[in-house]
């Protein structure tokens, strides 16, 4: 009788059990964003007041079995707003106070191959090879939702579009990653739709020092020193350059921390800090840079509010001067669903000796499949 009762109780579980995954299969997500911002005031002449653009980021994986897959990331973005080809500032992701702004950047969109890699993963480690973004820092991640502008400011020190390989040790509550790479100067560094051209292999920027002669090491995790909800990240990178006078290896370090303090079931506070020090930024000897991000994020139910300060200082060895930039931002956001959010920000920005006040909004939708 007991056996019959056990079979009866287990039968619905068997009937509705999830069918085993069939391989190969395709999985991933697509981040779609629409951003609009307006320069309220500025000391710089010739700045167009309005700007709007669409950003789309598909992450697609072709899974051969439970361990092996090919992973890709694509970016559809406007070349005149978001770029990595600023000759004066090779690390610059976005110049906020610029004349090339439009109410909607139609016709400026480029489709970039951000990542294209072979990936192996089991319970203990992850190995990948191909084109990828090495890990260094976290303040540039859009998922942080530190307002509209902070992630674009901090993209300056994000490592992007490299060719090489990496391995990650998947530990309990943390992971350690080692990458070895060089800049992508192949045809994959070009773009579809609006062409940006192939990246130069002879422009002497950091990362163009030869095959796999650059590397990075990072550690990211949670529950630091056993304290629940204390998240952290550490990173080191060393980028090679050619043996040319006035050029030296870029060496950088990052340390970041954030703590999730739960006030109640629906309310939490998150203090966040990330500090970055970069020597020979871009490969130029003596061009040293420092970035600091501090934020306080409050969450109540579906609402998010934050105040943040981002500062950068870059030494200019040729003129024995410093270029300082900063961003003070206040933001409020709302999450309609787990995948659909809106953020509105007011920011005071200092950039290249000029200052300005901006207001911006971003609509974000994440489609998973």
What name fits each language-model region?
Residues 176-177, 212-322:
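Detector for outer-membrane/organellar transmembrane beta-barrel domains
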Residues 47-56, 109-114, 121, 159-165, ...:
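Residues that define the transmembrane beta-barrel architecture of outer-membrane proteins
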Residues 23, 61-69, 122-125, 171-174, ...:
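Outer-membrane beta-barrel channels and translocator barrels
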Residues 34-42, 74-80, 122-124, 131-135, ...:
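Transmembrane beta-strands of outer-membrane beta-barrel pores
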Residues 22-36, 68-74, 127, 174-178, ...:
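Transmembrane beta-strands of outer-membrane beta-barrel proteins
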Residues 334, 355-369:
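Outer-membrane beta-barrel "beta-signal"
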Residues 53-186:
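Outer membrane beta-barrel
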């Amino acid at each position: 009788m007991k056996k019959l009762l056990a079979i009866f109780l287990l039968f619905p579980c068997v009937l509705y059990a999830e069918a085993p995954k069939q391989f190969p299969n395709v999985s991933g997500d697509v981040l779609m964003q629409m951003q609009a911002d307006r320069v309220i005031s500025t000391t710089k002449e010739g700045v167009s007041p309005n700007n709007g653009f669409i950003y789309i980021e598909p992450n697609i994986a072709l899974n051969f079995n439970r361990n092996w897959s090919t992973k890709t990331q694509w970016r559809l973005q406007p070349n005149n707003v978001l770029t990595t080809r600023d000759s004066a500032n090779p690390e610059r992701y976005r110049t906020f106070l610029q004349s090339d702004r439009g109410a909607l950047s139609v016709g400026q969109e480029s489709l970039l191959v951000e990542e294209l890699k072979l990936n192996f993963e089991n319970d203990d480690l992850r190995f990948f090879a191909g084109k990828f973004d090495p890990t260094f820092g976290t303040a540039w991640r859009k998922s942080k939702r530190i307002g509209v502008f902070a992630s674009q400011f901090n993209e300056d020190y994000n490592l992007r579009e490299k060719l090489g390989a990496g391995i990650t040790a998947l530990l309990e509550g943390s992971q350690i990653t080692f990458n070895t790479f060089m800049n992508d100067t192949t045809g994959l560094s070009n773009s579809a739709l609006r062409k940006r051209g192939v990246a130069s292999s002879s422009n002497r920027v950091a990362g163009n020092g030869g095959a796999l002669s650059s590397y990075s090491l990072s550690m990211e995790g949670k529950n630091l020193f056993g304290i629940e909800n204390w998240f952290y990240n550490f990173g080191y990178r060393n980028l090679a350059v050619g043996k040319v006078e006035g050029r030296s290896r870029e060496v950088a370090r990052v340390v970041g921390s954030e703590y999730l303090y739960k006030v109640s079931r629906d309310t939490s506070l998150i203090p966040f800090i990330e500090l970055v020090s970069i020597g020979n930024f871009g490969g130029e000897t003596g061009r040293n840079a420092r970035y600091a991000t501090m934020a306080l994020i409050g969450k109540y139910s579906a609402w998010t509010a934050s105040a943040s300060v981002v500062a950068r200082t870059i030494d200019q060895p040729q003129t024995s001067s410093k270029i300082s930039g900063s961003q003070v931002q206040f933001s409020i956001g709302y999450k309609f669903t787990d995948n659909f959010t809106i953020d509105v920000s007011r920011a005071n920005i200092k950039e290249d000796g000029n200052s300005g006040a901006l207001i911006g909004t971003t609509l974000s939708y994440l489609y998973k499949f």
